Amino acid sequence: MKKAALLNSDISSVVSRLGHTDSLVIGDAGLPIPETTTRIDLALTHNVPTFLQVVSVVTSEMQVEAAILAEEIIEKNPAVHDALLDQLKQLEQHQGNSIALHYVSHEEFKTQSGKSRAIIRSGECSPYANVILCAGVTF
């Protein structure tokens, strides 16, 4: 059995295959997922697991160089937005690099998410709790 925090075999497989600039999406329970994109569905019930819990575990094994958010999260979900920014700041310190933040419209976010390696669906039931994580390199 793995000792690391990330135990989900599907997520672990996707993370291990990411190359520089490949992306992985962590979304709320309502984010549409195109049929052509790999879906990893973790949602058990409302808010289980939460968006922030999934971000925390995934980023424990993924090198992140950029994050893309829907600009609507700033006004429509400030608590999750602020908590996510705190997590990304802590991740910067742990990784020893800066993580670029980009904001796009929710419509553009949905378009870009369809180009990712996979979309992980959390049980989060709050608006715009979605992030596209862009892979960096560890060297």
UniProtKB/Swiss-Prot annotation:
Organism lineage: Bacteria, Pseudomonadati, Pseudomonadota, Gammaproteobacteria, Enterobacterales
Top-level division of the source organism's lineage: Bacteria
Keyword Cytoplasm listed: yes
Organism: Pectobacterium carotovorum subsp. carotovorum (strain PC1)
InterPro entries named among the record's database cross-references: D-ribose_pyranase (IPR023064), RbsD-like_sf (IPR023750), RbsD_FucU (IPR007721)
Active site: H20 (proton donor)
Record's function text: Catalyzes the interconversion of beta-pyran and beta-furan forms of D-ribose.
Pfam families the record matches: RbsD_FucU (PF05025)
Location(s) in or outside the cell: Cytoplasm
Main location: cytoplasm
Residues that, per the record, bind substrate: D28, H106, Y128, A129, N130
Name of protein: D-ribose pyranase
SUPFAM superfamilies, sorted: RbsD-like
PANTHER family: D-RIBOSE PYRANASE
Similarity field: Belongs to the RbsD / FucU family. RbsD subfamily.
GO biological process, one term: D-ribose catabolic process
Keywords assigned by UniProt, alphabetized: Carbohydrate metabolism, Cytoplasm, Isomerase
Cellular component aspect of the GO annotation: cytosol
The protein's annotated pathway: Carbohydrate metabolism; D-ribose degradation; D-ribose 5-phosphate from beta-D-ribopyranose: step 1/2
Gene Ontology molecular-function annotations: D-ribose pyranase activity; intramolecular lyase activity; monosaccharide binding
Complex and partners: Homodecamer.
The reaction(s) this protein catalyses: beta-D-ribopyranose = beta-D-ribofuranose
Encoding gene per record: rbsD
Enzyme Commission identifier(s): 5.4.99.62
Entry-linked Gene3D superfamilies: RbsD-like domain (3.40.1650.10)
UniProt-listed NCBIfam families: PRK11797.1
